Amino acid sequence: MADLEEQLSDEEKVRIAAKFIIHAPPGEFNEVFNDVRLLLNNDNLLREGAAHAFAQYNLDQFTPVKIEGYEDQVLITEHGDLGNGKFLDPKNRICFKFDHLRKEATDPRPCEVENAVESWRTSVETALRAYVKEHYPNGVCTVYGKKIDGQQTIIACIESHQFQAKNFWNGRWRSEWKFTITPSTTQVVGILKIQVHYYEDGNVQLVSHKDIQDSLTVSNEVQTAKEFIKIVEAAENEYQTAISENYQTMSDTTFKALRRQLPVTRTKIDWNKILSYKIGKEMQNA
């Protein structure tokens, strides 16, 4: 082990540490960071060399953050990344600095938004917030309106998590939806992601995603938003149901094929009585 450590350069150590951090399960960033910190034993090297990993983790996970003075949380995503550690809160029309390690937002300031698409963005956000409130107990959503390749585009992001460290599990749902505002009809593209980590008496991770495509009728802002939410709700309900049914099937078939619940004798052993079984047999043979 010592020889291996001597062979690794600082650059290689940081690269390995960054991979651990980026792949940390939901709600376990701090635990993974602290473990990596102990292994690397060089705080300056870790902070400087793995800073990109901290940022990438928060962007990938749609990390929610509360901005002081504002009621609703906003998601940290690539769509709101303004560069130099600054992010956009499109609902409140503010920009803020975000510390990727501490996960804290500071220095909120007024920020310009894409006015040409703002009425569409607001309508979608209003409808999406009502949907998220109904379906996600801890859900947060952020809706962006921007021009991409000259086209007015709406991007809607949803995040919901449950961190139950005391019960040895953590999980996060993420979904991202996108469509351009074009006459008559447009295509909606979505991706749904689920990640769950269970670590009591074992170490099991569920990592799943599904790509979605559907057609959306474009009329006025409010009606288009309603039709968009119908697509989102149908797809996410179907995905959640499929995941639940799949794991029930695996429990009933695959897991049972991998391991017997009962030993070959088809009877359970009472381990509290195993000693008395042996003593009783020896007494009979005496």
Curated annotation (Swiss-Prot):
Q: What does this protein do?
A: F-actin-capping proteins bind in a Ca(2+)-independent manner to the fast growing ends of actin filaments (barbed end) thereby blocking the exchange of subunits at these ends. Unlike other capping proteins (such as gelsolin and severin), these proteins do not sever actin filaments.
PROSITE patterns cross-referenced by the UniProt entry: F_ACTIN_CAPPING_A_1, F_ACTIN_CAPPING_A_2
Gene behind the chain: CAPZA2
Q: GO:BP terms for this protein?
A: actin cytoskeleton organization; barbed-end actin filament capping; protein-containing complex assembly
Q: Which UniProt keywords apply?
A: Acetylation, Actin capping, Actin-binding, Phosphoprotein
* Name of this chain's protein: F-actin-capping protein subunit alpha-2
Which positions carry Phosphoserine? Answer: 9
- Please describe the quaternary structure of this protein: Component of the F-actin capping complex, composed of a heterodimer of an alpha and a beta subunit. Component of the WASH complex, composed of F-actin-capping protein subunit alpha (CAPZA1, CAPZA2 or CAPZA3), F-actin-capping protein subunit beta (CAPZB), WASH (WASHC1, WASH2P, WASH3P, WASH4P, WASH5P or WASH6P), WASHC2 (WASHC2A or WASHC2C), WASHC3, WASHC4 and WASHC5. Interacts with RCSD1/CAPZIP. Directly interacts with CRACD; this interaction decreases binding to actin.
Q: Which organism is it from?
A: Homo sapiens
| Domain of life per record | Eukaryota
Q: Which residues carry this modification: N-acetylalanine?
A: 2
- The question of whether Iron is a record keyword is answered with no
Is Phosphoprotein among this UniProt entry's keywords? yes
